Amino acid sequence: MILTTTEEVPGYAVGEVLGVVSGNTVRAKNVGRDITAGLKSLVGGELEEYTAMLADARTEAYNRMANAARDLGADAVVNVRFATSQTMAAAAELLAYGTAVKLVPRK
């Protein structure tokens, strides 16, 4: 499975567009993390707890999108994008989406 942010895959042409695929996850903040992050925000620097949480969320959303493409029989997902939104005061959604396609080798 090829996953790319570009419209094309080098050496291949899009033979069939299967449709938009997406994967998402919603993550809630942890009270312990909030306290630690609050203290760090006073002195500056990276909020490592949130960085790790968002990295995990990005991976989960990415994998769910890839699985949705596999379920359609796709060879690739092109134009992959990520979006985030706050769903409530203490939670955020991370969405990965793109276009599932069948590829044909260029001659």
From Swiss-Prot:
Pfam families assigned: YbjQ_1
Record-given protein name: UPF0145 protein Memar_1285
Family: Belongs to the UPF0145 family.
InterPro entries found in the cross-reference section: UPF0145_dom_sf, UPF0145_YbjQ-like
SUPFAM superfamilies from the UniProt entry: YbjQ-like
Top-rank taxon: Archaea
Native organism: Methanoculleus marisnigri (strain ATCC 35101 / DSM 1498 / JR1)
